[in-house]
Amino acid sequence: MSLQINTPDWILHANAPLRDLNTFHIQAQARWLLEIIHPTALPQALTHPHIVGLPILVLGSGSNVLLAANPEECVLRFVNREVTILEHRINHALVRAGAGMAWHDLVLWSLQQGLSGLENLALIPGTVGACSIQNIGAYGVQVEEFVHIVEAYDQTEGQFVRLTASECEFAYRNSRFKREPNRYLIAAVEFRLPLLHELKLNYAGISEELEALQITLPEPRDVAQAVINLRRRKLPDPEVLSNAGSFFKNPYLPREQAEQLRQHHPTLPIYPGETPESNKLSAAWLIEQCGWKGIREGDAGVAPQHALVLVNYGEATGAELLALARRIAASVQERFGVAIEPETRLIGAQW
């Protein structure tokens, strides 16, 4: 029987299986798995003799990771899922959510409270803690627009810190936490959510979906339902077909280079970049043009619905999925001269 140490504030497991803790359902094992119930006890838990001094790997819901090998680190999971309104103001509210809360649960809860802002981010897998690391985004919205404070344990300084949105250094699918992965352990996030705001409807089929639902004056909850419908049609359910959502980031190119590429490929979708001098390309389009959509090699494959999504049909290993991803990226580079990189975090391997 594997060793398990239980306290009211945390639980430490030895030789813990991770298959049910990652949405690729990769069979992997953690030498130590630490589950944090009350984050205030985190410093004490980290000094336990079995794990003191070990590097830490935070695993939320495992929805954005590929376990290419057994992690050497102590795997840490926050299981604090409480959510509360800290204060109400005339036009917004401050909301605090525990790092272990499922992101979609927070979206639904905020809508039930009459708050808005997160509706375009409905049904994104993962936890509240992970949302700030990845700066999750969808349908024209990024979470950085609503983050007020991130509460984290700074392993370098040995203390809890409260970082403002600007201090989080958010960028496209990036943040301070992603650039310093071994420093901060996010315990909770505070959000500044408006009571009313201008809905973003002009992105990727939302207006058409609302029309199909016969909604002419949409409210935030209607937008959330439209997004849920769209995502369910486009992306496979990880509980049915194991996956980690979009595996690759959309690449950014200098505007001139993007336009030159479209001259050779007139149907190439191009979107505004983060600056007037850059454009964002559709990684899904590039991959599909290389013939990868729906491909299956053993139990590793690319989803038939969406070329950005790698899938595990059953017993694929993390190494097999990583090898497939590398071949996909190499083919895009060879045909289009464009480098695509993983959005999914690689554990036990480098890109």
From Swiss-Prot:
GO terms for molecular function: FAD binding; UDP-N-acetylmuramate dehydrogenase activity. It is found in: Cytoplasm. The active site is at residues 173, 246, 343. Pfam families: FAD_binding_4 (PF01565), MurB_C (PF02873). Residues 25-196 form the FAD-binding PCMH-type domain. Keywords: Cell cycle, Cell division, Cell shape, Cell wall biogenesis/degradation, Cytoplasm, FAD, Flavoprotein, NADP, Oxidoreductase, Peptidoglycan synthesis. GO terms for cellular component: cytosol. Its main location: cytoplasm. Cell wall formation. This is UDP-N-acetylenolpyruvoylglucosamine reductase. It comes from Xylella fastidiosa (strain 9a5c). The lineage of its organism: Bacteria, Pseudomonadati, Pseudomonadota, Gammaproteobacteria, Lysobacterales. The gene is murB.
